[in-house]
């Protein structure tokens, strides 16, 4: 039969919002790439160099270039644009830890910026790898991310960010060049510090330059290029520059054309020139400064075109003086003095402390060419230093710097066919960086574990400190110190200095990382063995410009040229000036010191091939890099170590919010030992013990997941606190809204009445005195709500049916029911249907199951105006025939528990419809063929239904046709009363799931006591319909009139019975056994899940039971310690293990009564305990105190005479009368007994329940304010 799933709803009642704490709905990520290989090498099943190389190769072939080793990023140069640096990709990494997103350089940048903000510590990233592995690109992407992540609307902050980004194209133009291995190889070292203010916005910056490869200015090996700026300038110079500085194409200059390569495949020099000019303007270089920079570049190019010939004396002579004249014009010096400085060398002798003679020594063409190149290199080197200093001046324009993020972009390890002084300096710096990596990761980590007494298995690794000492040591002297001594010994002759250096190298033969081979020597670097040439190495180490060239520059009238060169040389100074080796050692040590003051991050870059091909992967080359970078040792230490360590003090300062014992409302409240605070934090954050260790001064967290969990909880702390305040405030506002709605509804009902109740009364008048009534239709809460399937709402079953059928009009009435379906030669069938009524149309909707899904189809679409008549029987059945006007289809014969409401609404929509009530229903079974259905009374019919067979309806006797509906009970609390609420649980977890249907279901499984939902007065009609159309299985038991339990009525709702009535009560109660055989069989299932009633007890009219005396409530008696009760009816139970099945007459102990109408009972022998309906139990009385049976004869006679008349009344009333601890008996209108009839029993029982709930709710309301702030 039809099931009412949802009761009537008010428009102002909204579905509760879903709580954000719930698991989000899973969605398919179409953009997520399939995982290739392993994203973190610490997860490798087998740790070896080969397995690492194989994993990197697999990912490289699939376009994935980034892989982790813990927090260290491995980057393989793809030699192509993968489209992974867009703004969309950048945004996806904001606020994410590295486990939430794929490996990426943006993840390293996000981690650095997050740690800067969270721990207020300087950060740096060390990018290492050989030349062409992608170090410069990684540095650019980190700068890109930090500039984007540090959003600020301040104009000054935005200007600084633009300046920082502009340093990339500017310094790349002047410091990078195309080599055989890399089209954009850094030929200098750069450490960029981005400084942040207290709001962690970039406010300043500083660039430190390391060892520019100035030799590249004057010469390159075949197929390499000079610095980018020379090709940009010569190809993209404006006409003004071409006219002022005589700029030609790069093929016209020796310095740019000698190597035979003036173009590169991936480089657009003209476009890059425009980018360089834009970067200059962004940084703040004015036009005059730009002009002077390009004037110096033009001078360098023209200096390279100065050629020398040998004169008659074998000395050098300038081949074309027009070139020297133009160079003198550009440098703004005297042309003759320039030529003299190029072809002659000034030497000065000394005698002790006295100045000696001065000699002008002529130079041969080779020597003159060397002097020319020295002048060009000196101008470019000093120009580059000036540009770096000028950038720093612009970046320091805004004060307020507090912390910084450093980005180290330095030349990679180099091994060429011929390696000289430049390579030994570059490789030395890379050795120092490797030493930092070892000290800060491998060595320092193990030393920390040992110092902190952490359980640890030592890992062997190679410490390259011995190689660094071999190069930089002072005592005993290293290679660079030996080179300085050779220069001091033979400073005038480069060849003699080289020979002296070769002799001193014999001192290192005992070192296992050094080998001497004729005019070469080998250093066994961490990245491999490198052979260096001795010839000319000492001259490069001098790094000195001839004094006559310095004096020449001192005579210039160009203030810019004077600015970029140092002060005049102190001719009287006897102190040896620092060599290039001294400078690089000093710079490297300063760099190490700077990096050691910051929290480091690491990016290890790998070059997959030497051909710069995006498809080639050289296993041998990559495997070599994997070995010398020490990736295997890094993986082993990472797997055995801890992802995070912090001192107790800083850990508590960071995470004390996570422990209620350490904090309150954001304040640190713990005054005990710091170690105890650490333990409390870890305990309250529920970090497993295996995930951390406590050392002597620090706490160690093993996995990144645990650290991220701590960080996530801390980030959400303030959100959770704000959410608590918001929930409390919203709850307060909702109470005010509910109270206002309640007041408004009450006022409206007092002024104009309830429209739903008015409609019910109108329908009752239409059938007044014509049709027997059902018990549920007499309830005071029964109102004609109309849309019982909630078709007008969204996301309901009714709206789903409405959409399937295609109903667009507003639904006036909807209900489930049945329709009689006739078949030729077979009995008619009762098929389930859905009835939907709009203002114009009445729909009868059929349902079928197809492919395990319910499908709804339109059986009837009846125009309300074409309904001629509605035919009903005069009994209490639910059948009605809808007679149509001149219809070509049969008239529907339908069955619905809300037939009266349907008939009433049809009548309201069409006043012409006739209502016919009689012993039969006449309808057209087929067009123009009238068919008659009869109705008969049968005791064998279902209690809440009927039987249809052979055109006859069999139904039980109903209430008299003139029975009146009960009035709607009044609100017991009045306008000032608070809403009745069920007692709130103090436990936090139960409060979280208050509105969850699943949680209710789970709680029902765990809670043995059946619970009841708070009543909604407007939904009682739906509940009545559900009970009417879904009766519980009938189990008939014999019942006597005297066995009806007495009602426990509150004293303020009852009055004392008269003395005559007391006597009648005694007689009626004593007739319990003698009258049992003469009673009918009625069913008494337990009353579960019935809604609460807030209305006071009322009396109703029941003419069939007017003169039957009913026992009043027994007088109150003292409760024994273990009171005995007797089962008045059979209680078979529903099968739940928490219930105690009983048979009539069983005696049990009652230890606990619940307001919901259940009692906890235990057998007399104590063998079993469970819940039973309170209404089924009566106090047990000893037979010695029972009134003699003979005294009750008169009562039995009366009962027997009237039993046939009140049979239906009792059977229907007993289903609804037993609620809570209140039971009532039937009375008539003229009876003085204050106890109500069975038809009024539901209201009476719910009234008693409501009284008790009001008292409980008052206690709840007193404590409710205190619970608000404890709501998580």
Curated annotation (Swiss-Prot):
Cell compartment(s), UniProt: Cytoplasm, Cytoskeleton, Actin patch
Residues found modified as Phosphoserine: 357
InterPro entries registered for this protein in UniProt: Fungal_myosin-I_SH3, Kinesin_motor_dom_sf, Myosin_head_motor_dom-like, Myosin_TH1, MYSc_Myo1, P-loop_NTPase, SH3-like_dom_sf, SH3_domain
Domain Myosin motor: 36-715
Ranges of compositional bias, category Polar residues: 1217-1236
Biased composition (Basic and acidic residues): 1089-1098
One Pfam family from the record: Myosin_TH1
Domain SH3: 1120-1182
Signal sequence segment: none
Low complexity compositional bias, start-end: 1066-1078
Domain IQ intervals: 719-739, 740-765
Post-translational modification: Phosphorylation of the TEDS site (Ser-357) is required for the polarization of the actin cytoskeleton and for ligand-induced, but not for constitutive internalization of STE2. Phosphorylation probably activates the myosin-I ATPase. Ser-357 is phosphorylated by CLA4 and STE20 in vitro.
Coiled coil: none
Record's compositionally biased regions (Basic residues): 980-1000
Compositional bias (Pro residues): 1109-1118
Listed GO MF terms: actin filament binding; ATP binding; hydrolase activity; microfilament motor activity; myosin binding
Region entry Disordered, spans: 1-20, 951-1015, 1029-1141, 1217-1272
Miscellaneous information on this protein: Present with 155 molecules/cell in log phase SD medium.
Subunit structure of this chain's protein: Interacts (via myosin motor domain) with SHE4; this interaction is important for proper localization and may regulate the interaction of the motor domain with actin. Interacts (via SH3 domain) with VRP1; this interaction is required for localization to sites of polarized growth and may regulate the interaction of the tail domain with actin. Interacts (via SH3 domain) with PAN1; this interaction is important for late stages of endocytopsis. Interacts (via SH3 domain) with BBC1 and LAS17. Interacts (via C-terminal acidic tail) with ARC19 and ARC40; ARC19 and ARC40 are Arp2/3 complex subunits.
Cross-referenced PANTHER family: MYOSIN, MYOSIN-3-RELATED
This protein's name: Myosin-3
Annotated source species: Saccharomyces cerevisiae (strain ATCC 204508 / S288c) (Baker's yeast)
């Amino acid at each position: 039969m039809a099931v009412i799933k949802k009761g009537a709803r008010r428009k102002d009642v909204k579905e509760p919002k879903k709580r954000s704490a719930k698991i989000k709905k899973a969605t398919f990520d179409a953009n997520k790439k399939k995982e290739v290989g392993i994203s973190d090498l610490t997860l490798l099943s087998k740790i070896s160099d080969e397995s690492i190389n194989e994993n990197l190769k697999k990912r490289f072939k699939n376009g994935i270039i980034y892989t982790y080793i813990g927090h260290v990023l491995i980057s393989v140069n793809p030699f192509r644009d993968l489209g992974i640096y867009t703004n969309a990709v950048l945004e996806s990494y904001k606020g994410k830890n590295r486990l939430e997103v794929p490996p990426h350089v943006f993840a390293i940048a996000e981690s650095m910026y997050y740690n800067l903000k969270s721990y207020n510590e300087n950060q740096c990233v060390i990018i290492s790898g050989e030349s062409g592995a992608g170090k410069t690109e990684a540095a650019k992407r980190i700068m890109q991310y930090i500039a984007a992540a540090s959003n600020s609307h301040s104009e000054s902050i935005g200007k600084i960010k633009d300046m920082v980004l502009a340093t990339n194209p500017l310094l790349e133009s002047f410091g990078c060049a195309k080599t055989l291995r890399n089209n954009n190889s850094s030929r200098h070292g750069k450490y960029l510090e981005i400084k942040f203010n207290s709001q962690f916005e970039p406010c300043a910056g500083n660039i430190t330059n390391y060892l520019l490869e100035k030799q590249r200015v004057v010469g390159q090996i075949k197929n390499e290029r000079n610095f980018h700026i020379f090709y940009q300038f010569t190809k993209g110079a404006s006409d003004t520059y071409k006219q002022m500085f005589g700029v030609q194409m790069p093929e016209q200059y020796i310095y740019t054309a000698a190597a035979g390569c003036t173009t590169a495949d991936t480089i657009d020099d003209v476009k890059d020139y425009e980018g360089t000019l834009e970067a200059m303007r962004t940084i703040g270089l004015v036009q005059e400064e730009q002009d002077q920079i390009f004037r110096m570049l033009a001078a360098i190019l023209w200096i390279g075109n100065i050629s020398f010939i040998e004169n008659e004396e074998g000395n050098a002579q300038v081949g074309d003086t027009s070139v020297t004249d133009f160079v003198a014009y550009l440098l703004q010096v005297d042309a003759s003095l320039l030529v003299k400085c190029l072809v002659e060398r000034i030497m000065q002798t000394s005698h002790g402390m006295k100045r000696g003679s001065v000699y002008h020594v002529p130079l041969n063409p080779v020597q003159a060419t060397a002097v020319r190149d020295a002048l060009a290199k000196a101008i470019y080197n000093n120009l580059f230093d000036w540009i770096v200093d000028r950038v720093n001046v612009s970046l320091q324009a805004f004060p307020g710097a507090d912390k910084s993020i450093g980005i180290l972009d330095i030349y990679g390890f180099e091994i060429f066919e011929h390696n000289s002084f430049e390579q030994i300096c570059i490789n030395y710096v890379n050795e120092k960086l490797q030493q930092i990596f070892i000290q800060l990761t491998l060595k320092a980590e193990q030393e920390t574990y040992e110092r902190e007494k952490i359980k640890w298995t030592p890992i062997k690794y190679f410490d390259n400190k011995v190689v660094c000492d071999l190069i930089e040591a002072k005592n005993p002297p290293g290679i660079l110190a030996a080179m300085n001594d050779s220069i001091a010994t033979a400073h005038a002759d480069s060849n003699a200095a080289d020979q002296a250096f070769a002799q001193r190298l014999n001192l290192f033969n005992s070192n296992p990382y050094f080998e001497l081979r004729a005019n070469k020597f080998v250093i066994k670097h961490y990245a491999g063995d490198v052979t260096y040439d001795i010839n000319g190495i000492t001259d490069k180490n001098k790094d000195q410009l001839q004094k006559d060239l310095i004096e020449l520059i001192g005579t210039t009238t160009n203030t810019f040229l004077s600015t970029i060169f140092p002060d005049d040389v102190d001719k009287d100074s006897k102190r040896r000036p620092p060599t290039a080796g001294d400078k690089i050692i000093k710079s490297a040590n300063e760099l190490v010191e700077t990096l050691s003051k910051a929290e480091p991050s690491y990016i290890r870059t790998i070059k997959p091939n030497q051909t710069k091909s995006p498809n080639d992967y050289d296993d041998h080359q990559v495997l070599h890099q994997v070995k010398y970078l020490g990736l295997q040792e890094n993986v082993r230490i990472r797997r055995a170590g801890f992802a995070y360590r912090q001192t107790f003090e800083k850990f508590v300062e960071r995470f004390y919010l996570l422990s209620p014992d350490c904090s309150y409302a954001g304040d640190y409240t713990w005054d005990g030992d710091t170690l105890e605070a650490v333990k409390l934090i870890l305990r309250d954050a529920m970090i497993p013990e295996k995930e951390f260790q406590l050392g002597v001064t620090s706490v160690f967290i093993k996995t990144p997941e645990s650290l991220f969990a701590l960080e996530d909880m801390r980030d959400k702390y303030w959100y959770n606190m704000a959410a608590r305040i918001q929930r409390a405030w919203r709850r307060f506002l909702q109470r005010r809204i509910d109270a206002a709605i309640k007041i408004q509804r009450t006022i409206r009902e007092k002024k104009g009445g309830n429209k739903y109740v008015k409609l019910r009364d109108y329908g009752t008048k239409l059938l007044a005195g014509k049709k027997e009534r059902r018990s549920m239709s007499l309830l005071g809460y029964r109102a004609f709500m109309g849309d019982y399937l909630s078709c007008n709402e969204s996301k309901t079953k009714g709206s789903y049916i409405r959409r399937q059928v295609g109903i667009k009009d507003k639904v006036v009435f909807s209900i489930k029911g049945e329709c009689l379906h006739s078949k030729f030669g077979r009995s008619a069938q009762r098929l389930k249907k859905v009835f939907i009524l709009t203002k114009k149309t009445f729909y009868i909707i059929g349902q079928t199951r197809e492919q395990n899904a319910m499908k709804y189809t339109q059986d009837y679409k009846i125009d309300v105006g074409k309904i001629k008549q509605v035919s009903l029987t005069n009994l209490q059945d639910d059948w009605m025939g809808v007679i149509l006007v001149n219809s070509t289809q049969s008239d529907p014969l339908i069955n619905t528990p809300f037939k009266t409401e349907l008939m009433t609404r049809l009548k309201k929509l069409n006043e012409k419809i006739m209502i016919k009530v009689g012993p039969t229903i006449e309808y057209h079974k087929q067009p123009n063929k009238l068919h008659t259905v009869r109705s008969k009374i049968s005791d064998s019919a279902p209690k809440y239904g009927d039987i249809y067979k052979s055109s006859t309806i069999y139904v039980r006797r109903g209430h008299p046709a003139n029975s009146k509906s009960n009035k709607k009970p009044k609100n017991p609390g009045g306008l000032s009363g608070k809403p009745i609420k069920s007692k709130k649980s103090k436990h936090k977890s139960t409060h979280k799931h208050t509105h969850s249907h699943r949680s209710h279901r789970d709680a029902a499984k765990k809670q043995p006591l059946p619970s009841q939902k708070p009543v909604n007065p407007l939904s009682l009609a739906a509940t009545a319909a559900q009970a009417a159309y879904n009766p519980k299985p009938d189990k008939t038991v014999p019942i006597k009139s005297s066995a009806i339990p007495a009602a426990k009525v509150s004293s303020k709702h009852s009055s004392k019975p008269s003395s005559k009535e007391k006597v009648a009560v005694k007689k009626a109660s004593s007739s319990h056994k003698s009258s049992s055989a003469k009673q009918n069989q009625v069913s008494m299932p337990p009353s579960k899940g019935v809604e609460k009633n807030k209305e006071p007890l009322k009396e109703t009219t029941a003419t069939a039971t007017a003169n039957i005396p009913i026992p009043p409530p027994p007088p109150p008696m003292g409760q024994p310690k273990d009171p005995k009760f007797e089962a008045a009816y059979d209680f078979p139970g529903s099968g739940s293990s928490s219930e105690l099945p009983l048979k009539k007459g069983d005696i049990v102990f009652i230890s606990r009564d619940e307001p919901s109408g259940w009692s906890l009972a235990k057998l007399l022998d104590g063998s079993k305990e469970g819940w039973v309906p309170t209404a089924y139990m009566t106090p047990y009385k000893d037979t010695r105190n029972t009134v003699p049976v003979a005294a009750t004869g008169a009562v039995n006679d009366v009962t027997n005479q009237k039993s046939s008349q009140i049979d239906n009344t009792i059977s229907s009333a007993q289903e609804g009368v037993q609620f809570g601890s209140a039971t009532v008996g039937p009375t008539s209108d003229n009876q003085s007994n204050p106890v109500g009839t069975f038809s009024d029993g539901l209201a009476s029982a719910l009234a008693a329940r409501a009284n008790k709930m009001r008292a409980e709710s008052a206690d709840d309301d007193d404590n409710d304010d205190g619970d608000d702030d404890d709501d998580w």
